[in-house]
Amino acid sequence: MGVNIRHNKDRKVWRKEPKSQDIYLRLLVKLYRFLARRTNSTFNQVVLKRLFLSRTNWPPLSLSRMIRKMKLPGQENKTPVVVGTITDDVRVQEVPKLKVCALHVTSRACSRILKAGGKILTFDQLALDSPKGRGTGLLSGPRKGREVYRHFGKAPRTPHSHTKPYVRSKGRKFERARGRWASRGYKN
């Protein structure tokens, strides 16, 4: 008898183009595909690769995180580049003067950056401004910041597991009994 060979894991899948049919995104892909081919800069290759990613891999970047990253030694006077969204953070009192480049900036973050005397560039403007990515710093938001990641990992209710269980409701009758959790009397 023959052996059934599973071919489902044979191929490593990576994107060669974005799944999205958004024409503006596809125009950016055309531009950065040209730049990645014609320049010897890895910056353009990384931007192109990030433009292909799925939306869950384009996590939003908060204003506070961006400011913190741009204060690091060697990052002063650089343009933060975000393939994704920049969102506002109410915990930040003062926004420094920043020149930023992103696919999308929320209205409140936009007004705060501009009010501080900053500037917001689109990726086509960045390509004219700095075709090789000189004087830029690539940033991205936390990919594991989504709530769903709290449910991943070691099974809930096992020792040393901090994984969040999927519970239908947070009511009195749902997984709150003695013997269910170590904190409820004992754990069976």
From Swiss-Prot:
Location in the cell: Cytoplasm, Cytosol; Cytoplasm; Rough endoplasmic reticulum
GO CC, one annotated term: cytosolic large ribosomal subunit
SUPFAM superfamilies: Ribosomal proteins L15p and L18e (SSF52080)
Modified-residue entries (Phosphoserine), positions: 130
Species, as recorded: Oryctolagus cuniculus (Rabbit)
Alphabetical list of PANTHER family matching this protein: 60S RIBOSOMAL PROTEIN L18 (PTHR10934), LARGE RIBOSOMAL SUBUNIT PROTEIN EL18 (PTHR10934:SF2)
Chief location: cytoplasm
Annotated gene: RPL18
Cross-linked sites for Glycyl lysine isopeptide (Lys-Gly) (interchain with G-Cter in SUMO2): 119, 164
Function according to Swiss-Prot or TrEMBL: Component of the large ribosomal subunit. The ribosome is a large ribonucleoprotein complex responsible for the synthesis of proteins in the cell.
InterPro entries: Ribosomal_eL18, Ribosomal_uL15/eL18, Ribosomal_uL15/eL18_sf
GO biological-process terms attached to the record: translation
Name assigned to this protein: Large ribosomal subunit protein eL18
